[in-house]
Amino acid sequence: MDVNPTLLFLKVPVQNAISTTFPYTGDPPYSHGTGTGYTMDTVNRTHQYSEKGKWTTNTETGAPQLNPIDGPLPEDNEPSGYAQTDCVLEAMAFLEESHPGIFENSCLETMEIVQQTRVDKLTQGRQTYDWTLNRNQPAATALANTIEIFRSNGLTANESGRLIDFLKDVMESMDKEEMEITTHFQRKRRVRDNMTKKMVTQRTIGKKKQRLNKKSYLIRALTLNTMTKDAERGKLKRRAIATPGMQIRGFVYFVETLARSICEKLEQSGLPVGGNEKKAKLANVVRKMMTNSQDTELSFTITGDNTKWNENQNPRMFLAMITYITRNQPEWFRNVLSIAPIMFSNKMARLGKGYMFESKSMKLRTQIPAEMLANIDLKYFNELTKKKIEKIRPLLIDGTASLSPGMMMGMFNMLSTVLGVSILNLGQKRYTKTTYWWDGLQSSDDFALIVNAPNHEGIQAGVDRFYRTCKLVGINMSKKKSYINRTGTFEFTSFFYRYGFVANFRMELPSFGVSGINESADMSIGVTVIKNNMINNDLGPATAQMALQLFIKDYRYTYRCHRGDTQIQTRRSFELKKLWEQTRSKAGLLVSDGGPNLYNIRNLHIPEVCLKWELMDEDYQGRLCNPLNPFVSHKEIESVNNAVVMPAHGPAKSMEYDAVATTHSWIPKRNRSILNTSQRGILEDEQMYQKCCNLFEKFFPSSSYRRPVGISSMVEAMVSRARIDARIDFESGRIKKEEFAEIMKICSTIEEL
């Protein structure tokens, strides 16, 4: 039946039709090759925004540094990073005046967290700059390498397992005259392959000891490695993002913990909450402004955009903020928190891989590493690159560029939000002392500003005052990219507000479909995505039913598991037909075994195995849920797993789904080729860590016990826990005397080892 498409919209309010404007089908763009050019752009731009600042030289590393703080007041509308210290401090003071006790309470909360955080907090996170190998590594490996080298250099505070003690080692390492590190190198040699008789390149990995003097070590400790940000839509040019090393990470974590605690108490902050909670918080601010703008008052909202937010922020300002926020706190706490901004004021940006040159005529390719850019003849480069290199040359040391101003992407999101909110806070009538007043929302660099005034001139004056106030703290509202509307219609962090936040379902579209993990997980994730969108994004019942049918179809095509009675021929149809004919209760077969789909929008919350369990033949149940099935290598069985789903905008989101482990929850084996490369040792390390952590979790399931606080090694903690558990089990009669004695003996043996 042909449907006239306009009929679909007869009952839909126009703002809900936003989901039909989805432009992002297809894959997002990924970056290839080197990020060196983008990083140089960032460094040069950041210095340009602060060019009228004062130049100094770092006495330890010899790096030239530009300090724009308290620089000239802006005379034009160009973006600039000249924040005024006294203005920032005053904004903080007013923020505290409007929220009595906010800083004090957040400091107390943070202090408690600082004393309890374990060093394994730093294993979270993805790629991390590993200063020992001078390249990126998984976070857990980078941390392990750092600790290993600290210990071999006599820094042992970290053995307590507390993050704060590891940070003591970091501080001490910076005072050492030299650090001895173990670094990897590759040997390549040509050998003849026995099987194919061809010549192949064999790589062996060697380890060698290397001494770093104080200067070289400091440069590495202060280095942020840079990469190109992938999968950014709607941009013509790529941009660089930074990944800091282990020395900086712990300090940043504590600063962000404090800032997060403050943001939670600020109604204008869009962080750290998300989703529906965020929408509710924001809707409150809008409601407040609309109710207070009586009939005589106008209310306008700016959907704001800031120019190069983090390139105009300055770590020195963050230091001033922290100094103010923690002013009545113990000395040790103030010191720990001030180290991150100090390290960022002295940071170095690693330029990445360098440039690749190729000669078409001679079919030659050669890589010019970043280290060589300082003194290579520029005649080989095109005009654009020449200019970049000339500009950055005075800043280069060992292939890294000195970058004192600016923050690099994504480092202090929470703290910079506090700064933004402090300016929004100044919009109250008691501070503006005139007829206009403002309020708004801030989430990292994204903001919405609501201005109320008796007439249009007042609105204009209010916006101007906000704009100028921002300039004083290094925030540059872009006049070109911000637009103003009557309050009631605006956009903030990709939420569209029109008399309430409009459910915008198109953002989630890329996450509908088959994930490609395995048959079991994919089915579970697929129905969970549909369920979540019905709850959160106004996905209506009819559309959800359709999405479900499309998903099942997609799933069957992906895994070639069409129903046993279908005519479609695939590689699997012979086996599936045979199974179909042998099965008495066909409704009990999983969709991935050629069974029928029993899902509808009412039972999406039930895992498929549970939904069909009662309908299954007994022998099918036995095959399906058999941990001894030799064909399946099982993960640890968790009741809940996490999947990564990709919305159209913003970062990948983690989504929980129910995991019932069956013989369909297989894990593909790791690619063999990695085992022959330099990464092999890293893999083995990672597996060892994984095993240790799993074992530890077995002894201390998070539900029953707070993590052991205090100074003991993992082994000691596990042994003492085993003894306590054994005693309880023995006294309550759950285990016999012999078993109890045996456990105690094992514990003693382990201790002696």
Curated annotation (Swiss-Prot):
It holds the Pfam family Flu_PB1. Phosphorylated by host PRKCA. One of its GO terms (biological process) is symbiont-mediated suppression of host mRNA transcription via inhibition of RNA polymerase II activity. Residues 52-82 are annotated as: Disordered. A motif (Nuclear localization signal) lies at residues 187-195, 203-216. Residues 286-483 form the RdRp catalytic domain. One of its GO terms (cellular component) is host cell nucleus. Residues 55-64 have a biased composition (Polar residues). Its EC number is 2.7.7.48. InterPro entries: RNA-dir_pol_NSvirus, RNA_pol_PB1_influenza. Keywords: Eukaryotic host gene expression shutoff by virus, Eukaryotic host transcription shutoff by virus, Host cytoplasm, Host gene expression shutoff by virus, Host nucleus, Host-virus interaction, Inhibition of host RNA polymerase II by virus, Nucleotide-binding, Nucleotidyltransferase, Phosphoprotein, RNA-directed RNA polymerase, Transferase, Viral RNA replication, Viral transcription. GO terms for molecular function: nucleotide binding; RNA binding; RNA-directed RNA polymerase activity. It catalyses: RNA(n) + a ribonucleoside 5'-triphosphate = RNA(n+1) + diphosphate. It is found in: Host nucleus; Host cytoplasm. Residues 249-256 are annotated as: Promoter-binding site. It is an enzyme of class 2 (transferase). Coiled coil: none annotated. Belongs to the influenza viruses polymerase PB1 family. Influenza RNA polymerase is composed of three subunits: PB1, PB2 and PA. Interacts (via N-terminus) with PA (via C-terminus). Interacts (via C-terminus) with PB2 (via N-terminus); this interaction is essential for transcription initiation. RNA-dependent RNA polymerase which is responsible for replication and transcription of virus RNA segments. The transcription of viral mRNAs occurs by a unique mechanism called cap-snatching. 5' methylated caps of cellular mRNAs are cleaved after 10-13 nucleotides by PA. In turn, these short capped RNAs are used as primers by PB1 for transcription of viral mRNAs. During virus replication, PB1 initiates RNA synthesis and copy vRNA into complementary RNA (cRNA) which in turn serves as a template for the production of more vRNAs. This is RNA-directed RNA polymerase catalytic subunit. The gene is PB1.
